[in-house]
Swiss-Prot record:
InterPro entries: Ribosomal_uS10, Ribosomal_uS10_CS, Ribosomal_uS10_dom, Ribosomal_uS10_dom_sf, Ribosomal_uS10_euk/arc
GO cellular component: cytosolic small ribosomal subunit
Recorded family membership: Belongs to the universal ribosomal protein uS10 family.
Complexes and interactors: Part of the 30S ribosomal subunit.
Protein's UniProt name: Small ribosomal subunit protein uS10
Known role: Involved in the binding of tRNA to the ribosomes.
Coiled-coil features, chain-numbered ranges: none
Length: 102
């Protein structure tokens, strides 16, 4: 049987967990085997900028950070389950990628 590997990424961890919970519920309802959600390492993007626009004065800096949280879910590629997963309302800040594996 084919498997579907679902990769999820988001800067908002609450929205990410809601989508993974919905996928879990679909797997339980349809009786499909599922492994995950597996938390992948969080990517931290750091940007340091100088506060002063002209370069004069004391050197003070602003530090900004963006965290990208990722999850991985493997699920059997049952037609009913996949159709329901495609219908999930995914928030704008969550990216979802589905790959079929044999």
């Amino acid at each position: 049987m084919q498997k579907a590997r679902i990769k999820l990424a988001s800067t908002n961890i609450k929205a990410l967990n809601e989508v993974t919970d919905q996928i879990k519920q679909i797997a339980e309802r349809t009786g499909v085997r599922m492994s995950g959600p597996i938390p992948l390492p969080t990517k931290r993007i750091r940007i340091t900028t100088r506060k002063s626009p002209d370069g004069e004065g004391s050197a003070t800096f602003d530090r900004f950070e963006l965290r990208v949280h990722k999850r991985l879910v493997d699920i059997e590629a049952d037609e009913r389950a996949m159709r329901q997963i495609m219908r999930i309302r995914v928030p704008e800040d969550v990216t979802i990628e589905i790959e079929l594996i044999s």
